[in-house]
Each structure stands twice: as C-alpha cells, then as structure tokens.
Amino acid sequence: MYGLLLENLSEYIKSVYGEEKWEDIRRQAGIDSPSFSVHQVYPENLLQKLAKKAQQVLGVSERDFMDQMGVYFVGFVGQYGYDRVLSVLGRHMRDFLNGLDNLHEYLKFSYPRMRAPSFICENETKQGLTLHYRSKRRGFVYYTMGQIREVARYFYHKEMHIELVREEILFDTVHVTFQLTFDNRAFTLASLAMTREEKHLPISAHVLFEIFPFCMVFGADMVVRSIGNSLMVILPELLGKKITAWFDLVRPLIAFKFQTILNRTNNIFELVTVDPVTERFDVQNEDLLQHEDGSEPEKSLRLKGQMVYMENWRMIMFLGTPVMPDLTSLITTGLYINDLSMHDFSRDLMLAGTQQSVELKLALDQEQQKSKKLEESMRLLDEEMRRTDELLYQMIPKQVADRLRRGENPIDTCEMFDSVSILFSDIVTFTEICSRITPMEVVSMLNAMYSIFDKLTERNSVYKVETIGDAYMVVAGAPDKDANHAERVCDMALDMVDAITDLKDPSTGQHLRIRVGVHSGAVVAGIVGLKMPRYCLFGDTVNTASRMESTSIAMKVHISESTKVLIGPNYKIIERGEIDVKGKGTMGTYWLEERENRLPLQLTAALQVHPLSPVPPTPTPKTKAIMPPVSKPLTPMMPVSVSLAASMPTSNVPAVDVMASSSSISGLALTAAAAAHMSLHHQAVVAEALTGASVEVALPSVASGATGAAAGGGAPSDDRNSRIYSPVTFKDVARRSVANSPVRSCAQPDQERRRESRSNSTGHVFMRTPSEIFGSLILDTEEFLEDLQISRSSLANNNNNQSPCGFSPTPPFRIGSAPPKPRPSNPDKFTPEELAAMDQLTPPSTAPARETASCSSASLDRDKATKLKKITFSNSSSLDATTPTALAAVVCPMRTKSPPMAVAPVMHMVQASTSKGDGQRPGSKDSVSSISLHSPPPHRSNSAPARPHSMSKAARKAFLAAKQTKAMEKLDKMIEEVQEVESQSVAKAANMRLALYGHDGGGDLAAGGCPLFLPPPPQQQQQQQQSLMPSSISDSGLCSHGHSHAPSCHHMDPKMTNSQSFQHSPRGGITHQCCSGFGHGNGRHSHRMHSNACRIL
C-alpha cells in the first residue's frame, strides 16, 4: 500500500478533528512517523489499524468514518494534480465509471506496485446502472462509495444514491455489487448512435493481421483460429490451441469465458503467458537480460488491448500490444523494434522511454532522498519540540502552558486555591560568606545547593516557584490540588536541612546552614507578564511564610499554627511559643523536628552534585620541605598544627636545631641525606617555625578519625552512607583558582617586565618561574663581585689607605694594580663584541651544575649600597655529602627538650659538594660552592634582563642560558684572580713575619701557637668577647665572612689559612687592640683582613 492513502487518512483527521486528535491516534496506534511519503510502500494492514484506532478515539462508526474519508480523498488528490486526470476521464458519468479500470492503468506508471481494484458496469439504464467492484483488499467498501458519490457531485454536478446490494468473498477477492441511481440520460444517446446503419468495407485478413501483429482470433470454444505476424514468430504453437491453456486473464477480474468477455467489451483486457517465453530462445549474452539495478526482468509475455466481437465471423478478436517497460524486457521476450506496429506510438514510446528512464530514475532517487531528509527533519523537529515542551513545563506548569498554547489570555489562567503550603529557605550569613569568597565561588555554591533542592522537589512532589539570590521557594497544593500538601512541604523542609550538611562553606570549611519557614493558607496563582512569564503566587499566605523563614534560626524548620493543624501526629513538633511577626502581631509558632519512619536520603549516582569549578585546575605553589618519598598513599593536605594534633602528642615532638637563612625566606631546602634523618612531623615543625606560615604537608593515613577531622577542618566528619548526595567541598576550587588569590603584588613596577608575586589564601608566596630565581641569583652575585672589584681596585697601591695595624697583612681581596674596568651603564645588555661571540658559546646543558639558594622577592632590598653593607660572600669548607653523620651535625647539631620554636642561634646554612681531588683549589669549575644569602637578603637587581619580545620562545631560552653561562664563567675567573692575589699577599706577610720573629713566637701548632705568629688575646678580653656573642635570632646585626682554604705554614709555600673569619658587632664591645670594631670570636683570630674590609664594608 502506497502512502497516498495513509496521508489521505492523516489529513482528513487533522482537518476535521484537529492536530491533537491525530497525534493521540498515532501514539495509541504505535506509529512513530508523524507523516507519510506519497510514493513509499507501507504494510497493507497499517491503514486498517489506524482507521480502527481513529474510530475508537473519535467515537464514530466504521461506515461514517470510511465514507467521509473517501469523500475527502477527491479533494485531497487535487493537491498532487490528479484532479485534472479525473476531470478528463469521461464526458459523462457513465463514461467515467466505464473508464475506471483505465484510470488505474494510467496510475501504474507512477505507482508500479499498485494493487488496483476492478470496476465493471452492467444493466445500464437512463436511471442508473449496476457496478461490480472487485479488490484484493478488505475494508474499502464504504471508502469506495464515498469516492464515487463525491466524483459525481464535484465533476459532473449530479446527486448519486449508492445502495450496497451484495458483498461476497471469493477466495482472496472481495466482490461487491452496487446499485447506482443517478441521471443517466447519456445512455439513451449512446443507444441511438449504435442503431444507425453502417456500411461494411471489405478488408483482407492478411492486411488485418499485418496492422495488428499481436492480435488473436478465437471462437466460442476458446480455440485460437488465427494470430498476428509477430505473435506467430515467438509463439508459433499457439495456433489451434485453447487460449486459456496459454494465457491467463489478469484484468478485468472476471472469468476467462467467451460469454463473460462479450459483456465486458468496454474494459481493457490484459493477458499474460502461462509459461515464460525466454526458454524458447537461446540468448548468448546473459548480461543483456539483467536490469540496471541487477534484478531479473519478467520472462512472460504480457499483452494489453481490447476485445472486439466480429459479428460476421462470430468470433472475438483480441487487439493487443506487448507491455514492454524497457529494452531489457524486449530482449528477454525475443522481440525487436520492427516487430511492433507502425501505425501507433509503440516504437516511439519504447525508444523515448529508454532515453528518459535514466533521468526519471535520477529524479526518483533525488525525490526519495529528499523524502528521507524531510522525515529526518521532521523527527528532529519533534525532538526539539519535546525538549522545548520540557523546558516550558519547568518554567510554567503543564496545565497552564497548555491553556496558553490554545490561545487563552494569561490573566484567565489565574486561579484561587483555598489551601496550599508554602516553604521559604535561605542561607544563614550569606552576605558574609559572599564577602569572603569570589563571585565564581558564590555561583558554584548556589548551583550545587539548588541542584540538590531541585532533586528533592521531585522526591517530595512539590512545585518550585522561584529562587532569588539564596532564597528558595516551593509550594504544594498548587497548581495541582493535593489534600496532603502540608505533609509534602514538611518532608521537603526536613530533607533540605539534612541535605545541606553535605555542602561546605568555601570560606570556613564548615557545612552551610539554612533556616526554613513553612505556612499554609489560601493564595491566588497564575501567569503574570507577557515577556518572560512566570507562575506566581499572591496573597497574605506568601508573606506569612516569608516571616516564618526570617524569624527562624539556623538548621531549624519553623512552622505556623495553620501548618501544624494540617500535618499528622507522626511529626515531632516542639512549641516555640508566641513571637512578634512583622505585620501580623503575636503568633504561636512551632519547631518541626522529625517525622516518624521517614525514608532516609538514599545515595544514588544520578543525584550526586558537584560544584562548578570556575577556572581550570592549576597547581598552586606551596611552601614545602624536601622530603624522602613516602610509599604509602597520602591523605589530603592539612595544616601542620591539625596534623600534629591528630597524629602525635606534643610532648613526643623533639626540638630540632635548624640552620636557616631568615624568617623572611619562604622555603626551607634540605638535602636528601639530611632529610632522611628527620620525620615528616619534624620537617613540618621546622618549616612552620622558619616561615611563619601554615605549611601543608602530606601525612600518611593515621586513623580514620584523625583523617576525617583534618579533612573537615578540625570537626569530625560523620559518614553519611544513607544520603543521596556526596559531600561537596569548595577547598579544591579555591586552591586551584589563580583568580581567587587575595594577594597579587608586583615588585618594582618600573621594570619593563614586572616580576609578579602571588600568594594564596594560606600566605604562601611563590615566584613566577624557577628560571627567574636562578637568573636573579646569578645576576646578583655577578653584580656584587663587580662592586667588590671596583671598590678594592680603588684601594690598590694606595699607601694612605694602609691598615694602621702592624699585624694585619695586605688586604687579601685586592685584585692588583691593574686599572679598574669601567662599569657599563647597563650591565645586563651585551656589548657588541659579546653579542657577536654569542653563537660560539657552549650550550647551557654543558655548563657545570651549580646549586643556588632562592629567596622571596618581597624581602629583597633595592639599594646596592645597603646591599654592600649587608651581604657577605663566604666560601665555607667542603663537607662530605655522603656522610649522614656529618650532615646531621650541620643540620641538627644538638637535640634538646626545648620547645620546637626555641631555635638555637642562627648560623649560616652551608651546602657544599665534595671536590674531585685533594689538590683542586676551591672555587674551580669541578667543585661546586653554594651561595648563602643572609638576613636581610638582597633585593633582586634592577638590571635583570628584560624579555626580548621580538624573539621566539626558543631564542629567549637561549638568550637567558647564554647570559647565565657568561655570569658563571666571569665568577670563576674573578675567584681565580682573588686566590692568586691572596696567595701572593700571604707569601709576602709570611716573609715579613719571618724577618721579624724568626722561628720564635708561636709557629708551633702542636704547642698551641698561632699559625700567624701572633700572640693570643688577653684572657679577660676573650671572655668578655665571648659573653657578647649573639645567642638568638634577634641579634640581627651579625655579619660574618669566611673563605675555605687549605692548611698553611710559614715554613712552606704561602697558602691560605685553614679557616679565618671575623665578626662585626655594631654595639662595639671588647675589640682587637689595633682597631676598633673588631674582636675575637669562637677562639679564632679574626683580625687578619678586617682593616681593609672595614673601609669597604
């Protein structure tokens, strides 16, 4: 069955009963497609299925429904141009009825798989005729009656009465007899024309059979007497045989008998051979027997024509022509073009049809593709309409939205509800929370809370009215009236209080707190506004419910007297007493505590809600200690104080003496070997004591209780396995968001490229990149040495600046008598010679590894003069990094029972690597020396190189690496010059002492003598000096200098002394006898190089 009939049914229902009825019928019948394609084939029983369902839904009888659908069909086919075909089918109504079979034959060209019915007229009079209807389909009797009656009225302007005379079923064919009564005066005119005399012209049989090459002549016994020329070629055995044995009568649907054929001479007859004719011919090329689509053609010969009674012969002549859809059928039957008759268009139609078949096939394919696209578009449209309806129903109640769709005025949707229950809730201290967090965190928090509450509205069957800020409003009893509206709202309130405990306050870590108020009463509800319409509630009940919420307290459900009366006795209620309500006076209210046997919130994955992260997660730098790897999984980050309290008692924490740079330095670096001797808690205590900030460390899982306490911000976390929501915290959101940093400072705003320093909520400061820290340290060191060289060079060979101390040698840091190198105006820019030689520099990866110390940019001083007074460059003696005891002695020289914060006097934290050989001099490229920056640390130099914006990323990396390599090479060169000059100075001083003292005066080291041939200081002076040594970190005026040298003796070649140092105390004290401001310290002589250093520093 083609979709033309199904589309007729669909359009009839839509036009008469409406679109909604058709959609209802289609859904009940289980039909997914909203429309049908006219040329597509559908199941045979589909129309009957839809018709029966429509009769049930519409409440009409089968006869009325099918008859009216047939009447509608005549106007419906006019949309596709078939009304013109119907109008020219016959001059009179009787001609139309006699030509109905021919109409279906024409339509077969457009609908090749059509199973057309057969119509035969008989007993014709001027008052009407008898019509026989035969069809393979059942259930179309009344449908046919409506079509014929409408054709008579529409095209021939005649009123027709149709009577069903008989209906019978013969095998699979339905045979129905109609008696048609109408004005049939055209039949009288036709009878008069048949009675006129006709002159018979003689014609020979040879000419007749040549004009009709496929004709057949048979008598009353159905034996073939003669056949046409072309038929003689392909069926020569047919002559003299019964036609019923060789052919079947396909149309009309009557018995293949002589008398029956005489009564149906006005119809087109179609005969088909019983046996295939291709078996009689040997076709060599089998490819010619295939259609273009690969299917096999029909092998039987099909003839269509007219039956003419030859009165002189008393026989019937069948004037037929072969039905050939294409050339393939012609080849299959063994025929040729010249076998077709010349006087008609058989040959032209065959050739023209072949030429147009490709175009028609292409057009058909395009039409089918468009039809499929249209169906897909209709399906997508239905899906979008469904989603639109869902969105609309979330904003407006379904019953109200349907009324608006039907065109009702929005004001007409307002309705009075005698009793409803309204709930209001809001967050306690919401304004304060918003002031402590970012706007994105506020949005994320509200989204998480509202998502949970929206799920609870579905659980308790209440309607969400609106949300304003942190306020949430729901109602029960409207728009759907419900007798248990108070209980539903109370259950919603209890669920909201329970569910809010799973949401955390981002600013404090505690769970959010809400207050809830409920009141019951009468309201008016409806749609307000034309743009962005909303379903609103009006009445005093709304105001009272809002007052119940505003007078409630945190985590409590406050209900009124009217709500208490409506709920059952299974609710636990505590009387609050009378309170003053604004605008209401004194009211008696109650606390709703719990409901007996209330179902707990179940944990389901579909209802879990997670906050919206405002920014992509980025790692936030933390102040941390270098620790050995921990094999066990780590718990979430927690403050040190919380972790210590949760995991170990305070009395068990030993005091640790740690050497650090300053309290202003934000990080503590320990070597891996030394860190192995310290527990995680010890390192946390050390880091917290030195930085003054809460250092977060990862601790192994100690106990479930401790872990829960730490994760909950100190409060014990209750394991809510029965909840529908997993706990939601915003700690990670705040930690990952760079935009959430409350501090964002820029050091030196006048620089081309500002060094930005950010700190998170815990106060941890971090630089932009590690390479900048390293580059800053190298540039600061280089600048310091250049300043030192310029200052010392100005004192070289100057007799007026000689030290007044006769025991002090020549300043060891003097570079020589060479003139000082002029300092460039911008030391960070390469000279043209340096830029030309940059291509010859060694790649950065080949430079020797050097260890650097970093410090916070916020604590650096900008003044270079102050820097010269506060910075001391020291080379300390090398330590064996592989010996744990040696490192432990450096890091933790003593362990006492003093509290952790009582740190020993601050010392220089030195980290040095073991030199490759004993004979190597310190400071060479093979040995690495660490640089300690002491309190107060120097500010990063203003001469930091600006980022060359015109360079690519790779070029900038190469530029910075070349700069750092150049600085390291200059540092090595300067150290070598210093060592060389100092060696010369030591040799000169040794010769002078040898000339003065000879071998007496203290050169014996074994006897306790001074290696510099100097007498020891007075005992009293030494004791007083030791008593004035600073003992805590508060003695910040300490300034210390030192160099690592090999042992020396005046008898040997001049070498640097083992460990020479001096301390400078601004407060004065017991000093050396030769110079004010210098004294002995730690039992060592510290006057060797103070005289010239005093002038410099």
Curated annotation (Swiss-Prot):
GO-annotated cellular components: guanylate cyclase complex, soluble
Cofactor annotation comment: Binds 1 or 2 heme groups per heterodimer.
Residue ranges of every copy of the Guanylate cyclase domain listed in the record: 421-549
Subcellular location: Cytoplasm
Keywords: cGMP biosynthesis, Coiled coil, Cytoplasm, GTP-binding, Heme, Iron, Lyase, Magnesium, Manganese, Metal-binding, Nucleotide-binding
Listed EC numbers: 4.6.1.2
Catalytic activity: GTP = 3',5'-cyclic GMP + diphosphate
Note, other: There are two types of guanylate cyclases: soluble forms and membrane-associated receptor forms.
Protein name: Soluble guanylate cyclase 88E
